[in-house]
């Protein structure tokens, strides 16, 4: 087990004048990021261990403790890279627990830059685990913490490092696909939570994915009656043939009501699987706007988020009727700055 109590105690003892961002105490940012990441994990239902996620969130910005970065936050001098130095702290925790978790290390190393191929990442960490490099990393950790007067309570034991290195060399390609998915989930949760906390988001705001209360229009002609029957038959067949997550197709002629049928089938599948969101993807911007209008009619304007290359920032969930006072809301800034999907339905 990783020494979570010791880490939490150490973080709580950091002086408040050690910042993550101007005026924001680093310890508060790390705890805030961890809390948001866990809330996102629970919402999305990804198969990522809460312990690993919290651990990497609590150390992901420790490289900012360096005196040069603190001076930069106060407008003095240039900043220095902090993501890679932050991985050194996580490496000590992994070695303390005899764990091999390159995905967590890489999530921190890449949370402000590009991702690296798995083979290259494993080569990088194999080199870092060499005895000479361990001594160099120990000195760098001490240098990073120098002005804080807070010695790091964990070390880089060579025996544990050798075991970690051996595992990398012998098992590097094991279950590559599932580990890649795990890495992408860890990275996504970390980056999203980190940005949210930096922008001032302290808790998640979201609407539930609720069934539409808009009934089908009353048939006034024979075509309307056919559409109603087609809607009923498609929904029944789709529900009966559903075998879990996968690819399903719906083929209907123009004018059959595919948009409404598609949304209702997607909602039925979401209810069967416990999904919290619908993502309705379309190939052309013109029909994205058209289908988004249908979705807003079905679910309400606040429950639908439009996302495409020509979209202008229009307040909460891109609602044209949004109050201008919402422009300073941290979550609204997150939505417009990073195109974060927060609404129950994204088109």
Map each language-model feature to its residues.
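Switch/connector loops and helix/strand junctions flanking conserved nucleotide-binding motifs
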Residues: 66, 115-121, 288-290, 314-324
């Amino acid at each position: 087990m990783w020494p979570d109590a010791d880490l939490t105690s150490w973080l709580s003892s950091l002086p408040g004048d050690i910042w993550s961002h101007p005026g924001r105490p680093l310890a508060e940012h790390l705890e805030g990021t961890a809390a948001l990441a866990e809330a996102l994990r629970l919402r999305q239902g990804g198969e990522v261990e809460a312990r690993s996620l919290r651990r990497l969130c609590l150390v992901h910005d420790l490289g900012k403790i360096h005196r040069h970065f603190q001076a930069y936050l106060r407008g003095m001098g240039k900043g220095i890279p902090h993501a890679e130095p932050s991985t050194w702290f996580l490496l000590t925790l992994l070695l303390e627990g005899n764990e091999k978790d390159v995905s967590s290390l890489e999530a921190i190393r890449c949370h402000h830059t590009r991702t690296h191929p798995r083979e290259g990442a494993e080569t990088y960490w194999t080199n870092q685990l060499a005895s000479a490099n361990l001594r160099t990393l120990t000195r760098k950790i001490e240098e990073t913490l120098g002005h804080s007067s807070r010695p790091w309570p964990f070390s880089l034991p060579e025996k544990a490092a050798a075991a970690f290195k051996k595992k990398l060399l012998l098992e590097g390609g094991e279950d590559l696909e599932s580990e890649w998915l795990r890495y992408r989930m860890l990275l996504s949760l970390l980056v999203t939570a980190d940005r949210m906390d930096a922008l001032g988001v302290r808790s998640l705001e979201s609407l539930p994915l609720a069934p539409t209360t808009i009934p089908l229009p009353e048939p006034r002609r024979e075509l309307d009656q056919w559409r109603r029957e087609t809607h009923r038959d498609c929904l029944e067949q789709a529900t009966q043939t559903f075998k879990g997550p996968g690819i399903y197709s719906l083929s209907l002629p123009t004018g059959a009501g595919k948009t409404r049928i598609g949304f209702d089938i997607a909602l039925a599948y979401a209810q069967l699987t416990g999904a919290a969101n619908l993502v309705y993807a379309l190939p052309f911007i013109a029909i994205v706007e058209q289908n988004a209008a249908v979705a807003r009619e079905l679910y309400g304007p606040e429950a639908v988020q439009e996302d495409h290359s020509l979209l202008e920032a229009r307040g909460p969930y891109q609602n044209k009727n949004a109050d201008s006072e919402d422009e300073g809301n941290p979550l609204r800034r997150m939505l417009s700055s990073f195109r974060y999907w927060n609404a129950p339905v994204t088109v």
